[in-house]
């Protein structure tokens, strides 16, 4: 996201559409995002903690920011794909062209399709297979009465952190399709057939 945003114009910057203020995961995502953005030189024009991760709330807030900041919005960090969809809807309604870079998380099907059409820049994919393999390993150890250890402890809970994967238009086939998370048939519905062909998917 930081590498992709073009915020060289004076006064330009980004919006941060964070997750729900009552979700502890959202607080971690927000802290992690700030740990990168704050040292990047990007200016945060405004940020919003989205109640209930509600895309309509995200859309409403971004609409207000478009009215206030207009063409100064060079990018939108969204904490998940639902809020990214809300942000993009606001940008579309306001006829913002070209669209600023918008990110998301969760590799939702609608987000993959928005990436194909160029509406969304990327999403964060957390592969299921490594999570399942690690969970199975822990379950087997517990079943055998073995002690389970982890390299980290987060809020008093032993934890192993797995690497998330950034998915852009260039690596849809090598990530979510290769892992069977989504199939080509899932992604390339008639409405997205041309975009799939242009991206070499299918």
Model-derived features with residue positions:
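A residue-level marker of the well-folded mature domains of exported/periplasmic proteins
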Residues: 1-202
